[in-house]
Amino acid sequence: MARIAGINIPDHKHTVIALTAIYGIGKTRSQAICAAAGIAENVKISELSEEQIDKLRDEVGKFTVEGDLRREVTLNIKRLLDLGCYRGLRHRRGLPVRGQRTKTNARTRKGPRKPIKK
């Protein structure tokens, strides 16, 4: 297994799909990384040489991924909470942040229904 950005990349998958195992890299960014490194998208990770894997590591290193990205997202949410703005209050209350309706739906964000005790 190749290790890129501290993550074990699955050997049996194609390069584009395997790179999406890294937090912060989706399919589009993965395709861009493969193109920049000069690696075909349909080649499996196990078929790559060490030089090609090093090229992939260099290209992935240009982006904010994994722990740094998680930390950045957490700090952004914490900043909103500290500001006390509307979005911060929605985060604090565990409600949808981006204007979705909450009279019905929003169950994922609000959690399971709490029965009214009589």
From Swiss-Prot:
Q: Decide whether keyword tRNA-binding is in the record.
A: yes
Disordered: where is this region? 94-118
Q: Which UniProt keywords apply?
A: Ribonucleoprotein, Ribosomal protein, RNA-binding, rRNA-binding, tRNA-binding
**Gene Ontology CC entries for this record:** cytosol; small ribosomal subunit
According to its UniProt record, what is one Pfam family this protein matches? Ribosomal_S13
The cross-references to PROSITE patterns, in alphabetical order and at most eight, read:
RIBOSOMAL_S13_1, RIBOSOMAL_S13_2
InterPro entries, per database record: Rbsml_uS13_C, Ribosomal_uS13, Ribosomal_uS13-like_H2TH, Ribosomal_uS13_bac-type, Ribosomal_uS13_CS
Single Gene Ontology BP annotation: translation
Q: Which GO terms describe its molecular function?
A: rRNA binding; structural constituent of ribosome; tRNA binding
RNA-binding among the record's keywords? yes
What biological function has been recorded for the protein in this entry?
Located at the top of the head of the 30S subunit, it contacts several helices of the 16S rRNA. In the 70S ribosome it contacts the 23S rRNA (bridge B1a) and protein L5 of the 50S subunit (bridge B1b), connecting the 2 subunits; these bridges are implicated in subunit movement. Contacts the tRNAs in the A and P-sites.
What's this protein's family per the entry?
Answer: Belongs to the universal ribosomal protein uS13 family.
Complex formation? Part of the 30S ribosomal subunit. Forms a loose heterodimer with protein S19. Forms two bridges to the 50S subunit in the 70S ribosome.
This chain's protein is named Small ribosomal subunit protein uS13
Biological source species: Mannheimia succiniciproducens (strain KCTC 0769BP / MBEL55E)
